[in-house]
Curated annotation (Swiss-Prot):
Its main location: cytoplasm. Pathway: Amino-acid biosynthesis; L-leucine biosynthesis; L-leucine from 3-methyl-2-oxobutanoate: step 1/4. This is 2-isopropylmalate synthase. PROSITE patterns: AIPM_HOMOCIT_SYNTH_1 (PS00815), AIPM_HOMOCIT_SYNTH_2 (PS00816), PYR_CT (PS50991). InterPro entries: 2-IPM_HCS-like (IPR050073), 2-isopropylmalate_synth_dimer (IPR013709), AIPM/Hcit_synth_CS (IPR002034), Aldolase_TIM (IPR013785), LeuA/HCS_post-cat (IPR054691), LeuA_allosteric_dom_sf (IPR036230), LeuA_bact_synth (IPR005671), PYR_CT (IPR000891). It comes from Prochlorococcus marinus (strain MIT 9313). It catalyses: 3-methyl-2-oxobutanoate + acetyl-CoA + H2O = (2S)-2-isopropylmalate + CoA + H(+). SMART domains: LeuA_dimer (SM00917).
Amino acid sequence: MAKDPGRVLIFDTTLRDGEQSPGASLNLEEKLAIAQQLARLGVDVIEAGFPFASQGDFAAVQRIAQQVGGDEGPIICGLARASRADIKACADAVAPAPRRRIHTFIATSDIHLEHKLRKSRAEVLAIVPEMVAYARSLVDDVEFSCEDAARSDPEFLYEVIEAAIAAGAGTINIPDTVGFTTPSEFGALIAGIDCHVPNMNEAVISVHGHNDLGLAVANFLEAVKSGARQFECTINGIGERAGNAALEELVMALYVRRRYFNPFFGREPDSPTPLTAVRTEEITKTSRLVSNLTGMVVQPNKAIVGSNAFAHESGIHQDGVLKNRLTYEIVDARTVGLSDNRISLGKLSGRSAVRARLEELGYDLTREDLDEAFARFKDLADRKRDITDRDLEAIVSEQVQQSEARFQLRLVQVSCGSSLRPTATVILAQEDGQEQTAAAVGTGPVDAVCRALNALAGEPNELIEFSVKSVTEGIDAMGEVTIRLRRDGQLFSGHSADTDVVVAAAQAFVNALNRLVAGCGRQSLHPQHDAVLADLRSGI
């Protein structure tokens, strides 16, 4: 049987596979903020990125290894294709972390071997032990993935896995790369691996799933029963195409149904010992942070973290919940950190009170960042009577987005009405501090603002999405605006919040422009789509 750590290990790949969602690119400071929150959440492994992809990816993984990795913190992991260059870059990037891992992979399905790698099974079987052994010579912890394992020939899969373990892999990951399999099939695949790989007792079985058929979490829960003990997932289920298995759904399924799953870990059904190390009360906060920074809006009916997840419209349901919440709720909202708590802070509140509350919310700001956050708080308090935790989160998450700013919005002013043509005037500052002014008319105030900003920025783009929602209830609520721009097939998201949605839209547009400027011209390699390297072709 495979190694059994006695519980489920949560491997978070939000910063690697999750960031591959179109438009979800993150800058270094945003990645660091998410990694720090993932550590507070209690994940076991953070896959911080794909270091060989670009200098930016390398720097982000290295910074996370330096600042988030620790003796008691999560393992910091980097992804590497089965090539020496990838593996060496990965080892260098994760080197600062006391607990570090290289995650290397190669495809094993016939369709990938024929059309992507153009290699025979024998060639792949020769590459695997060589590259795993090389990775093992650089770090003590190596994970190996058989890309597209769910569509691979099981007998060949067993051979590859046996060779990888013999070469030093301590974790074997079985990905359903294209979201093709079903729960019963996936469970049988994991059980077959556990049974037919002779040295499987020397490694942990991990699984990685995509949600193309909406089955990722269901597949994972079946894999638990068959011996899988590490699960690779993302916050809010973000990822390529239909996304990845959602961390919050998997963790809460194991939490709510632990009486059912406990026996598969050799426990009594009523054992109170948690099946994961995740601090569930941090789930909602983590979900909001990832949504804010990536611009990926969480659908209202999303399980666990959607805005309607704990809402009841039916009168019968409302009556039952008022009498006993367990009549229609299987999860206490407080378990996942959902609270209506309002903080008693206002325009007379001091800097220390704001700092204390931000620390309680999990934000560790530098003096400069705190000064800026406090200034924004005071400005908001002048316009809004009650300040909520959501308001503070919106303030801080927007600050993080502005760390790589070529453009700074200095002023936005609009005039519009039933008999007026919407007109906007904006002032935009460049990196050198030089300010420029432009005015434009549009079909509405937001359109006019975007036209004026584009006239100053001079960066070709196409606006493909504009969305706005309220942070909290009330007529003075902050409005959250998300904007997506497209250029040369790439998507760039911007996000902002303000009590004035036109101001929020202007800032969100500027944030998206800054991402566009930073991202164009330095597109990163994709670990799967760019998997064929010259050295891989030569068998190195």
